[in-house]
Each structure stands twice: as structure tokens, then as C-alpha cells.
Amino acid sequence: MMKNLFEQSRSHWVRYDHYELKTAEDGKRYITPGKSAKPDVYNPLKEVPNIVLDALNVGMLMMGRKPEAEVEKAIMEFITRYGLLGLMTALPTTPSFMDYEAVYLPKNHFIKEESMATDKYLSLFYPFDQLDLVKKGIESTWNVSGDRTMIALTMTFMDEPMAKNMSFQREYAEPYEWVAQQFKDWAFTLTTAILYYNDYDSIDEDARGLYRKAMAAFGGIAPSYHIELLDKPTIYWDFHSLLLGIQMMFSFMLVDGDQPLRLCKNCQKVFLGSRSNAAFCSPRCKNQYNVYKSRSKKGGNEEE
């Protein structure tokens, strides 16, 4: 069912062939496309399940307190493979926030304010080069000029919300800490679900309640969709951020009983299990785990 759901679906996102970490004047680090990076339009749904597994495994590095250099490398590899998360359009109540006088924000991990002036909000994602944009009230004018590639990219997404189109431009950047936090949140959600069922019999009802509460906080604004008549009827998901797309794919995978998401007992890597009690991501990990186990048993016996 899971496989079929995404095989009959399409969506699109933009990734560049090169991203870099840059530090802004305020000392904050941002991920942004490189100066001469080339954009590529692709279908994230064709990347299931790897896009979700990769996102979760980046988060697991942080949950496992791995060295910062290892985490940073994994984050940059993910972004290069799949593109930025689209935080600018993921956080507000609507991705069409350019059509309103201000930006309205539901509760989130990154911005405390419930509403924000549009120019102030945009400055969070354009710390280096501004777009040629004029906004008066609900009216917005955006001039794209010079770079042919950027003009072509803008024309491709003319029917999309203006902010989504803007987030595909080279000038767009996302705060590194926010991106890292999002990966960590996804990994936390998975470990909460796995621990809840693993520890169910050994924890009391209060602890179970805390797990359920943590899980209930995971959710998102459902993406809209329409049907396109291609070579066969196809669901076209209108993801206005990659974040929302991953969140939806992750949700479906989390409840899939046929190929459950599991954590490897040996290396802590997230993998798709062929059955609900699968404990290892590979025969190699199973062997390693058993070798360590028998060694520690031997060591214990010798000490006695």
C-alpha cells in the first residue's frame, strides 16, 4: 500500500548541485546555494523511502551526540542530495503569506512571535543578498533580472505561491541551527514511537502518558493535492516545503505495518524492517552484535 501510494503520486522540489555554509554579520551560520550552483527540478516522492531514512539518520547522529563535524557533513550531504527544507514557507500559517499584510506563525521551535512584518520575516532567509522586491500592504512586486537560469526557474513556478518561488532562488538561505533542529525533531519522534512499544510492559501509565503526549505533538498542516491525467490518473501533491513533504512521507512510513521503521540494535541506524521485530539493519550488524555479546559474557565469567 505504502509503495503504491507514492508510485501513483508526483510532486516537485528544487535542489542545487552545490551548497555552502556561510556566516552572516550576526555570527549565525546559514546553508545557501553556491554562487554558480545549478538548480535541478526533481520529484521527491521518487526518493521514498531513502529521503526519509536519510533525514532520520542525520537526526540520530545528534541524538547519539556524535562529533559536530560528522553531523555537519551529514547535513550538508542531505541538503546537496535533496535541497533545502523550505522553512520559509513551512513555518507560516500559509505559504501564500506574500498576499497578506504580515506573516502569521503557529507555534514552532524557531520563532517565538505569533506574527511578524513581512520584510523582517524575509530577512531571516536572505541574510546575504536581498531579492529585488517591493511590498506595499498586500501588493508585492518582485523583479527577476540578469541570470537566465533564475528567470527560467521563476517562470517554471509562476503558478506557485510567490514565497515558494522565491525560496528556489540562489539568494535564499536557511539557518544551519534550524535545519539541524528539524532533523533532530524527526529522530526524536521515531525514537519516542519505538521506545513506547519496546518499553510498554516495563513502564507505568504516567510514563506511557508522557510518550503519548510527545507523539501527539508531531503533526503538520496537510498538503493540498489534485489529480492529473497523465499516462494514468496521478495524485499531484502540492508540497510548499520539502519539510512538509518529508513529514507526510515519514507519517505514512511510521504507521506502515508491512515495512516498519526500526532502529538497528548494533549501530543505531534507522532502517525499514521486513517484519515488526526486525532488530538489525544488516547480517553484518547482527554478527557484530552477537560477537560483542558473547565476548562480554566470557569476560564476565572470567572475572567470576
Feature map (PLM): residue ranges:
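Short helix-coil boundary/hinge micro-motifs
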Residues: 1-271
